[in-house]
Amino acid sequence: VAKVTDPGNEAGFIPEKDRIAVFDMDGTLTCETYYTYYDTMMFIEYCLNDHPERVSDELKRVAAAIRPGYTADETLARNFARAYAGMTMEEFYDYAVEFGQKHTASFQNMRYIDNFYLPMAELVRYLYENGFTIYVISGTERTTTRAIVANSPIRDYVTPDHVIGTDFEVKQAGYEDVPSNMDFKYENGDELVITGGFIQKNLNANKSIYIEREIGRRPVLAFGNSGSDTSMMNYTIDSRNPYPAQAYMVVADDTVREWGTQDWTEKSEEYLAKGYIPISMEKDFAQIYGEGITRAAEQYHARDLSD
C-alpha cells in the first residue's frame, strides 16, 4: 500500500481512480459456518419458521435437508429465488436485515449480523483510508449482500452500488408474465418484485465477467477463500494488468475459535503455487469476532419440524 500510494514511486504508483480492491464475502469477510452461509440460513428460517405458509412443501424439504458441508450450487440458489417470489425488493431487503438480528446456535452470543471477521473489516477500512475503492463480489444474492454490508462494520466504506452478487429475476409488479421489459414502463408508485425466476449465480468465471461488466477495470487487490473465487483472483493478477496486483486467500484453519476444516500446510502450498498469498485465520487473526462471541459445543443443531 505504501508503494502504490507514493507518487514518487514511478514503477509502482497507482492513481486513486485505479485502486480497486475486490472482496468475496462468505468465508472471506464473514462467517460461513453457522452452520452454513447467511443466505442459506435465511432461506431455512424463512421456509421452516417465519413463513412456511408462503412456500411449497418441496422447498420446505430442501430447507430441512441442508447440513454443514452442503454444496452451494446454482440449483439451491434457484430454490432461494422461488422461495421469495412475490416479495417487493423493499420487503426482501427488510427481511434480510430482520433475519440478521436472530441468533445462531453454532456460536455463543452471536447474531447472524455479527458475522464479520474483525481483521478483514479493519483491512477494508485501511484500504479505504488509503484511497482504494472497495467492491464486495459475492455468491450471495445482491440485495441480501447489500443488506448485510449496510449493517456491518464496513458500511461506511462500501456503497450499495459497489456490491455485486447473484441475481434473481425482478419484474415490475403486474407484468411478471410479460416476456420483455421493453413492453411496459415504470410509473410513480409501481413496485419491483421477485418473480421466482433466476438470472445468474455469481461464482467462478461469473465473478470475473461481472467485474468486467460492472467495474470495467481490473482490480489491483483481490481477496477470497475458496475455489469459486479463483477466477476473480486470476483476473486480478493476470499478466495484462497494467498495475502491480496481488491476490490473497483466507484459510479456514482455526478449529478453536471457528469451525475450521482446512489444513494450513496443504492449502498454503496450493495457493502459493497459484500465485496467491495465504492468510491463516488461526495464526494471523488476533481476534475473529466481537467480544463474548465463542464457538458453541456443536455446529449443527437439528430442528423440531413436528409442527
What are these model-predicted stretches?
Residues 1-25, 33-34, 47, 52:
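Non-catalytic pre-domain segments flanking phosphatase-related domains
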Residues 6-9, 13-15, 73, 78, ...:
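Residue-level detector of functional hotspots within protein domains
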Residues 2-5, 9-11, 65, 195-196, ...:
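Mixed-charge, polar/low-complexity N-terminal
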Residues 13, 18, 94-135, 139-307:
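C-terminal cap/substrate-recognition subdomain and adjoining C-terminal extension
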Residues 34-35, 40-114, 118:
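A metal-dependent, Asp-based hydrolase signature
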